[in-house]
């Protein structure tokens, strides 16, 4: 979607967001009292809009893909039987 299709509340540096490694999501406080959220996988796919699930506000996340945490390798979590 183009910028015209979004009503962006603000731009937020990813360093100002909180990362939850268990959920693999970034969050940032929303003025409504909830949190803007965006998944690590979405950021890695080039998406940069975090949304608040409680209101209509959205923020643009400023980040470099190369600086994101690496997603856990699904194959690495599978035990290999001998």
UniProtKB/Swiss-Prot annotation:
Primary localisation category: cytoplasm
The protein's name in its UniProt record: Diphthamide biosynthesis protein 3
Molecular function terms from GO: ferrous iron binding; iron chaperone activity; oxidoreductase activity
Domain notes: The DPH-type metal-binding (MB) domain can also bind zinc. However, iron is the physiological binding partner as zinc binding impairs the protein electron donor function.
Gene name of the record: dph-3
Cited InterPro entries: DPH3/4-like, DPH_MB_dom, DPH_MB_sf
Localization annotation: Cytoplasm; Nucleus
Domain named DPH-type MB: residues: 8-64
Annotated GO CC locations: cytoplasm; nucleus
Record carries keyword Disulfide bond: no
Pathway annotation: Protein modification; peptidyl-diphthamide biosynthesis
Needed cofactors: Fe(2+)
Family designation: Belongs to the DPH3 family.
Residues annotated to bind Fe cation: 30, 32, 52, 55
Pfam family for this entry, one: Zn_ribbon_CSL
Alphabetical GO biological process terms: protein histidyl modification to diphthamide; tRNA wobble base 5-methoxycarbonylmethyl-2-thiouridinylation
Primary role: Required for the first step of diphthamide biosynthesis, a post-translational modification of histidine which occurs in elongation factor 2. Dph-1 and dph-2 transfer a 3-amino-3-carboxypropyl (ACP) group from S-adenosyl-L-methionine (SAM) to a histidine residue, the reaction is assisted by a reduction system comprising dph-3 and a NADH-dependent reductase, predominantly cbr-1. Acts as an electron donor to reduce the Fe-S cluster in dph1-dph2 keeping the [4Fe-4S] clusters in the active and reduced state.
Subunit relationships: Component of the 2-(3-amino-3-carboxypropyl)histidine synthase complex composed of dph-1, dph-2, dph-3 and a NADH-dependent reductase, predominantly cbr-1.
Keyword terms: Cytoplasm, Iron, Metal-binding, Nucleus, Oxidoreductase
Catalytic activity of the protein: [3Fe-4S](1+)-[protein] + Fe(2+)-[Dph3] = [3Fe-4S](0)-[protein] + Fe(3+)-[Dph3]; 2 [3Fe-4S](0)-[protein] + 2 Fe(2+)-[Dph3] + NADH = 2 [4Fe-4S](1+)-[protein] + 2 [Dph3] + NAD(+) + H(+)
